[in-house]
Amino acid sequence: MSDKNIRCSFCGRTQKEVKKLIAGPGVYICDECVKLAYDIIEEEDSEEIEEENQEFVLPKPHEIKNFLDQYVIGQERAKKILSVAVYNHYKRIFMRSKITEDVEIQKSNVLLIGPTGVGKTLLAETLAKFLKVPFAIADATTLTEAGYVGEDVENILLRLIQNADWDIKRAEKGIVYIDEIDKISRKSENPSITRDVSGEGVQQALLRIVEGTIANVPPQGGRKHPYQEFIQINTKDILFIAGGSFEGIEKIVEKRLDVSNIGFGAQIEPKNRKSLTQILNHIIPEDLIKFGMIPEFVGRFPVVAVLEPLSEEALLKILTEPKNALVKQYKALLSMEGVEINFTDEALKAIVKEAIDKATGARGLRAVMEELMLDLMYELPNLGIKKFTVTPELVYNRNKISQDLLKKLAG
């Protein structure tokens, strides 16, 4: 066939009628047909994504917070911040085709700041439960950068994949909660010349997966080695929530506030009149950097929510009100044995008082309840007692419960 007679095998246009004509074994395709084929494939992919997204009904921020309210007592501001951040995160994913090219919506990873036992992990867990997305928890203190003894950051993603039943597409829209994130702060503000195995190096390793990358995950876990096969997962749509107590950061915030409010018109409250939460609500990225988080890592967590220490009243509500309240759980378990158990108001207050003494927030409630209920759940079904009331006496003597004491209190 002469050059003049060469035609596109698909549309029949001659070489002169098109910009390019690509030759294959016995066939030719023009640039316009290549573009058309590309557009068809793109459209089909887009339709598949839209079908996938239609299955996921994105709840509004109010609905998300209402669900959180059923499990998490208090923390109103944190729940509101988290609800909006999560809504925007998934809206960014599922409405991607409607976002104009000149706008780029940043990923809204979340940093939760608050003392131990105030509900940081529970908030993240409850969100994943409500949205029906895969969820994984990691402890930042067990992570090390590549080449050191410890856990690779990619193992976090392996847990997420496992919890998604090895469905990579589902895992790519999951939620990862990284606890104790403050424990990997570097030891000083200045970048260290020597290696910081548990601090800056881990932040750098996490940074890659948090900001969005194609990560290579070893399917068996453990360390990577050159001869194993990897699972590839795109992390750009995974929501990362990090939590930590950041003990001492309030001093950094106070120092900055005191300096910036010196002079005419200063309206800062005296230190003794400001609560820890009031101080922490003024946290800015520079405070986190001074604490020891690297600027790039701080920049990848644009949403910051501060959780308040739990008051006695809040602990009392946590004990009795949520769907998963400990009192409700133990009542349900004993009712299966035909035992009706009740707690006096004074007994509940005693449990809270004992939990406060442990200084571990809501975790203290579980510790006290487990100590109290161990012998009750062991003895009551065996004694044939059908109705029992827990009193403060029993709470304070929970490690000395005997059959005689139970019979006496039941009688």
Swiss-Prot record:
CDD domains: RecA-like_ClpX. GO terms for biological process: cell division; proteolysis involved in protein catabolic process. ATP binds at residues 115-122. Residues 1-49 form the ClpX-type ZB domain. Zn(2+) binds at residues 8, 11, 30, 33. SMART domains: AAA (SM00382), ClpB_D2-small (SM01086), zf-C4_ClpX (SM00994). It comes from the Bacteria. Keywords: ATP-binding, Chaperone, Metal-binding, Nucleotide-binding, Zinc. GO terms for molecular function: ATP binding; ATP hydrolysis activity; ATP-dependent protein folding chaperone; protein dimerization activity; unfolded protein binding; zinc ion binding. Component of the ClpX-ClpP complex. Forms a hexameric ring that, in the presence of ATP, binds to fourteen ClpP subunits assembled into a disk-like structure with a central cavity, resembling the structure of eukaryotic proteasomes. Belongs to the ClpX chaperone family. NCBIfam families: clpX (TIGR00382), PRK05342.1 (NF003745). ATP-dependent specificity component of the Clp protease. It directs the protease to specific substrates. Can perform chaperone functions in the absence of ClpP. This is ATP-dependent Clp protease ATP-binding subunit ClpX.
